[in-house]
From Swiss-Prot:
GO terms for molecular function: metal ion transmembrane transporter activity. It is a multi-pass membrane protein. It is found in: Membrane. The keyword Metal-binding does not apply. Its main location: membrane. Keywords: Membrane, Transmembrane, Transmembrane helix. The chain crosses the membrane at residues 12-32, 39-59, 71-91, 135-155, 175-195, 207-227. Belongs to the GDT1 family. This is GDT1-like protein 4. It holds the Pfam family GDT1. One of its GO terms (cellular component) is endoplasmic reticulum. The keyword Lipid metabolism does not apply.
Length: 230
């Protein structure tokens, strides 16, 4: 088992480059323009923290189900696979434009029309709920909070970053992995919520993909060169 610091550092770097231009990053930026920022930030962060803890728990449990030697080899292959995947995406990208930002915005607009709600309608409904009994709970678990939570939680489910977190927690100290992941999620999500669409549109998906690919390859090489007890 590696040190907490090593798990923290690798998780922080991996999560940051995976999330800074991810779909959930763009979703947080767009939602923050339409709804109260504190509710969007709370919902997005809650979902990402829960997902990080779940992923790290799965990774921690993996060596107890199969041998640590096999989990180490699987993790190494995951790093190389995700590295090549990210590099391919990076080389395939055109310029610095954000096509994914436009896709996420279109999906959110479609969802908004399907529900027949506008941000103002949601705010009015929230104000009415506050006047009812259990005002504290309805304020905390507001429709906006739940919307931000669900979009980010299901957006991360089965994503490359989730699988990488599982693999990293199987090979590194799980506490360090969770801590590094949470710090990175906080930094990325806060930047998205504060910066909004203007910041998101300035991010080059190509540079992010190439940086993430190189980082995954480095992790793969380091994992390959690291001996592990059976």
């Amino acid at each position: 088992m590696s040190s907490v610091l090593q798990g923290f550092t690798k998780s922080l770097a991996m999560t940051f480059v995976s999330e800074i231009g991810d779909k959930t990053f763009f979703a947080a930026a767009i939602l923050a323009m339409r709804y109260p920022r504190r509710l969007v930030l709370a919902g997005c962060l809650s979902a990402l923290i829960v997902m990080t803890i779940l992923s790290a728990t799965l990774g921690w449990a993996a060596p107890n189900l199969i041998s640590r030697k096999w989990t180490h080899h699987i993790t190494t292959l995951l790093f190389f696979g995700f590295g090549l995947w990210s590099l391919w995406d990076g080389f395939k990208e055109g310029g610095g434009g954000s096509e994914e930002l436009a896709e996420v915005e279109a999906e959110l607009d479609a969802d908004l029309k399907a529900n027949g709600k506008s941000p103002k309608d949601s705010s009015k409904r929230e104000d009415e709920n506050k006047k009812q009994n259990r005002a504290f709970l309805t304020q905390f678990f507001s429709p906006i909070f739940l919307k931000a939570f669900s979009i980010n939680f299901f957006g991360e489910w089965g994503d490359k970053s989730q699988l990488a977190t599982i693999g990293l927690a199987a090979d590194e100290n799980p506490f360090g992995v969770v801590l590094g992941g949470v710090v990175a999620q906080f930094l990325c999500t806060t930047a998205a919520v504060i910066g909004g669409k203007s910041l998101a549109s300035q991010i080059s998906e190509r540079i992010v993909a190439l940086s993430g690919g190189m980082l995954f390859i480095i992790f793969g090489i380091q994992s390959y060169l690291t001996s592990v007890e059976a």
